[in-house]
Structures are given as structure tokens and as C-alpha cells.
Amino acid sequence: MQMKKVVLLGDSIRLIGYGKHVAEFLGRDYDVWQPSENSRFASFMLRQVFDHRDRIAGADAVHFNAGLWDLCDLFGDGPFTPKEEYVATLLRTVSVLKQQGAGTLIFATTTPAGPGKKDHSIERTAEYNRAAVEALKREGVIINDLFGLVSTDIGAYIRPDDMLHLTATAEIVCAKQTADIIAASITAAAGKRTPGSLK
């Protein structure tokens, strides 16, 4: 059986978090690739889509997340990226990924910060997630709700030292959910193809 090609894009929640374990959960039938750099803002991730276009071309699934950098309000005068611009950039990213021949597209919602992390308020995170999910669903993007998953036990899933990144336990839990969604989505997409269109 031909290996399924999977690409992971995203910020540090991916890079030093769930992304470290997805390949293990998916197993030997999947070829998982991800950049070794942080995707940071949604706009930087869009740039990565260009830089890594050869890796992305023909991928059976591209799983992506961005938002922590965008919604951050360090100075008290508003987030780095306005919500409307954030959503527009995600939509542009989806459009480019489709042009590059990527198959199933999966967006992971932005994870919540710990209590007292004012520059990453849970309310603003939820607001950005709602806007992104509403827009991306219309484009056929599958949603991996990491916000909902991590919100079930922030104390266990968000590191107390920085109130932002995933604990070791959360890395595994998020990776398992991510791998399950990727595998199920690729299987479902394959079932929709006619015999003559199979890769």
C-alpha cells in the first residue's frame, strides 16, 4: 500500500507539542513531514506554504494551526493581528493549499492559555476560534478542536511555568486526537473517490 503523505504546519503548540508525536500515532503507513521552524503568525504560516510548496504538493492531508501569536495583546492596545485579518489570512492559506494540490485540509483551533495570562485571554481565544471555524467550514476544512480538548482540564494540560504551552500529558492527548482525525479524514476522502480517480 502506498504511504499517505501528511504535512503539519503550525506554531509552537505543534513544533514543541503535539507535532512531536503524531507520526508515532499514525504509524508506518503515513509519511509525516513538518517544518523545523515555528509558524508563528498566520501570515508567516502562509509564507511557509510558499517556501515548502514542494513538500505540500500532492499531500493527502495538511493539518495546520495558528493563532496564539495573532491574538496576543502584549501592550494593552489590541491583538497583533485583528480578527478579520486573521480569518482572511487563513482563508487565503486554504486557497493556496488547494491550488498546490493538497488533499484534505484540517485546522486545529487555538489552545487556551492558563488563568491569569492576560495577553492571551480565553475569551479572545474563543472569539478568534469561532470566527475561524465558521469561515473555514464553509471552505470544506475539517476542524480539530484542540481548544475544546485542552479546555476540559487546563490545569493538567497547560504548563504552569509559562501558562501557554502544552504539558507532556497534553502533547500526547492532542497528538492522539490529531492523528485520529487525520487518519479518519484521509480514509473518508479515499472512499469518496471513484475507482478511476484513485491515486
Question: What are these language model-derived features?
Answer:
Residues Q2-R92, H165:
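Conserved SGNH/GDSL esterase-like catalytic core that processes O-acyl groups on lipids
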Residues E85-A88, R92-V96, E127-E134:
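Alpha-helical scaffolding segments of alpha/beta enzyme cores, especially the outer helices
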Residues D54-G58, Q100-G101, S185:
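Glycine-rich phosphate-binding loop signature in dinucleotide/nucleotide-binding domains
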